[in-house]
Amino acid sequence: MFMTQIVFGIAPTLLKTFSHLTALDLWRPSAPYVFDPVTSSTYLGTIADGVEEFLGIFYGQDTGGSNRFAPPKPYIPSRHSFINASTAGAACPQPYVPLPADPYTVLTNVSEDCLSLRIARPENTKSTAKLPVMVWLYGGGASVGTAYDVSYNPVGLIQQSVVNGSPVIYVAINYRVNLFGHAFSDALLKSKSTNLAMQDQRLGIEWIKNHISAFGGDPDNITLFGEDEGATYIALHILSNHEVPFHRAILQSGAAITHHDVNGNRSARNFAAVAARCNCLSDGDRQVDSQDTVDCLRRVPMEDLVNATFEVAHSVDPVNGFRAFMPAVDGYMIPDEPSNLLSRGQVPANISILAGWTRDESSMSVPTSIRTAADAASFISTQFPLLNASTIHHFLTSLYPESDFTTNSPSSPEKVTPAWRATSALHRDLTLTCPTIFQAWSLRLSSNCTTPVYLYELRQSPFATALNNSGVGYLGIVHFSDVPYVFNELERTYYITDPEENKLAQRMSASWTAFASGAFPLCERSERSLGRWEEAYGGDRVCRDRMPEHVRVKGIGDNGDQDDGDEIGKLMARCGFINRLEY
């Protein structure tokens, strides 16, 4: 969408820049535009509901061909370009139906030319505004996902930030996932071509720091926020060998030690399996760790490689194909096991943290066929093979006794047992809650206890009615329940009109943007936000090496946003034991 006086005479080499040009685009005086003095380029976007959006802005070059399984290269537009930023960018390689359990979500544009940004800002934002910048990293088990997913529509978030008096700019980074973002072999290690998802994200953040001021953002006030694997990526960036290029972090259902298989074995094993399926291991002298294997896989057509990748992924996780390929220690992006880095205090200071989880994070990951303690022990031993039988017995008899868990569900309570509920809670704490608490304390300790840390537990779900109507209300406050609230898009995206649900979305969205703006926790405006929110370890006057026995976790939702002292006390006792284990 460009000015007519410069359209004529454009060289064919600028086709990528002008790829969506139409005659009507040339005469859209209402379209917002941004001039970037760094590249002397102009971006033409869209506007709706008081929010301006700029879509499909490339920060990296095409990752196909010789750039497959290689570090991202910056994309630099030709000077004086007029760039159409009104169309969503392509999703990075993944199935057109990313999740078999969700056949209604179908991607129509999948390409290796996918390293792009989605930027949104309040209407009429000036380049001099210096608004806080919130950068979103999506989840999806390190396997699927895109910045343009309808669940991440930023309009409601931006609108609420304006209403709340803390306007922000939103940026979502598109990056490689699955094998394309987490291939792992000796040859790739030697060329520093591992953890490419994180390298993509890093390049995207560098673009933001260099160019966001043209959009009215403050490059010195960046908050990263993400959910699931997105939160894990953020936590790993904090522990990376590189300078941390952001100032605050919001970790929703993810931590650096959420995964306990980060030595690269899983990704390497599955990389070899994909290579075999693609006939890239057929020669006797062609070993999986050789450069020949990488070169062979670079020649495989994208769709064939995606198919082979997810055949292997679904052999690891038959339901979703998650985490067959995942972040791994490489000495470059991830210098060591995250638990070791946190224990040694090798973490940067002055990164403010807001982190939390949903009450029933693991309910959809634990089979309802668990009826007894023996069933529970068998499941836990399979999921966590490094835990011995005596430790599992201690968990199930002392720390997670069935007497602590009831089946008080309004929907078919007979479908689950106390043993299932205990197992769900234990799985949640092993994979997420206790690692989050340990990481939060380690980050606070690294700053000599001067950096604020806030924790929360979500106790309400926008999906409750749908779950009850489907007969699975016992699943409770499921994973991903926080995302619709944070983006404040219940009505537009999920057709949820309940006033109380939408009120919580407005308040939660307001608190997230307030945190990013530095106005957190907005005690004086509790009706517009979640109100008073005490620091997790705010009562400790002395900075101790040992984690305190008590922590403040804000309950969000049905309890009127109050802490539940008894439950948090039990949680800390359980985490005190879990965080001493190696598993």
Curated annotation (Swiss-Prot):
Gene3D superfamilies to which the protein is assigned, alphabetical: alpha/beta hydrolase
Residues making up the signal peptide according to the UniProt record: 1-23
GO BP annotations, alphabetical order: (M)-viriditoxin biosynthetic process
Disruption phenotype: Alters the ratio of the 2 atropisomers of viriditoxin by favoring the production of the P form instead of the M form.
Pfam families, per the entry: COesterase
Keywords: Glycoprotein, Signal
UniProt-annotated glycosylation sites, renumbered to this chain: N84, N109, N221, N265, N307, N350, N388, N448, N468
Pathway: Secondary metabolite biosynthesis
Family of the protein in this entry: Belongs to the type-B carboxylesterase/lipase family.
Function: Inactive carboxylesterase-like protein; part of the gene cluster that mediates the biosynthesis of viriditoxin, one of the 'classical' secondary metabolites produced by fungi and that has antibacterial activity. The first step is performed by the polyketide synthase VdtA which condenses one acetyl-CoA and 6 malonyl-CoA units to form the heptaketide monomer backbone of viriditoxin. The product of VdtA is then O-methylated on C7 by the O-methyltransferase VdtC. The O-methyl group is important for the stereoselective coupling of the monomers at the final step of viriditoxin biosynthesis.
Name of this chain's protein: Inactive carboxylesterase-like protein VdtD
Organism: Byssochlamys spectabilis
Encoding gene, per UniProt annotation: VdtD
